[in-house]
Amino acid sequence: MQVNHLLRQAVKQTTRAGRLGSRKPHKPLLPPLQLYRRILREHRNLPTMQRELGDQYVKNEFKLHKSTDNPLYIVGFLASWQDYLHMITRGEWEEGTLSTDLLEKMSPEQVTQLYELMKEAEQLKSGGE
């Protein structure tokens, strides 16, 4: 399968290059299936609603990106999900905030989606629908 070959090549390049964004050089990327399973396993420690939402989102994202063949995109995708895995493993998901830099990089549609998600989350947290 060409995707597996490209993935292996991209992971090797990332490991040799050392740093990608906020990644540390001593943490190589996990293979996609292993990363996917570890994320779902780690979601078991989340409250039920967050687990269901997280599981659904992870499954959808991995399914949508399954046919990607751009090595740089694959590395970025895996690096972001691996950072997410480390964040939920350490319990930092509850205090998560977005930096101004990250918000500036988002499209207007993404900002709107994020705002809608925030409103929904606040409604669920307060107990109303």
Swiss-Prot record:
Q: Name one GO cellular component term.
A: mitochondrial intermembrane space
Residue range of the transit peptide in the UniProt record, numbered on this chain: 1-21
Report any one BP term from Gene Ontology: mitochondrial respiratory chain complex II assembly
Primary subcellular site in the record, as a coarse category: mitochondrion
Question: Does the entry feature the keyword Mitochondrion, yes or no?
Answer: yes
- Cellular location(s): Mitochondrion matrix
Whether Chaperone counts among this entry's keywords is yes
The alphabetized UniProt keywords are: Chaperone, Gluconeogenesis, Mitochondrion, Transit peptide
Q: Which Pfam families match?
A: Complex1_LYR_2
Reported function: Plays an essential role in the assembly of succinate dehydrogenase (SDH), an enzyme complex (also referred to as respiratory complex II) that is a component of both the tricarboxylic acid (TCA) cycle and the mitochondrial electron transport chain, and which couples the oxidation of succinate to fumarate with the reduction of ubiquinone (coenzyme Q) to ubiquinol. Promotes maturation of the iron-sulfur protein subunit of the SDH catalytic dimer, protecting it from the deleterious effects of oxidants. May act together with SDHAF1.
Assembly and partners are described as: Interacts with the iron-sulfur protein subunit within the SDH catalytic dimer.
| Family membership | Belongs to the complex I LYR family. SDHAF3 subfamily.
Designated name of the protein = Succinate dehydrogenase assembly factor 3, mitochondrial
Q: What species does this protein belong to?
A: Kluyveromyces lactis (strain ATCC 8585 / CBS 2359 / DSM 70799 / NBRC 1267 / NRRL Y-1140 / WM37) (Yeast)
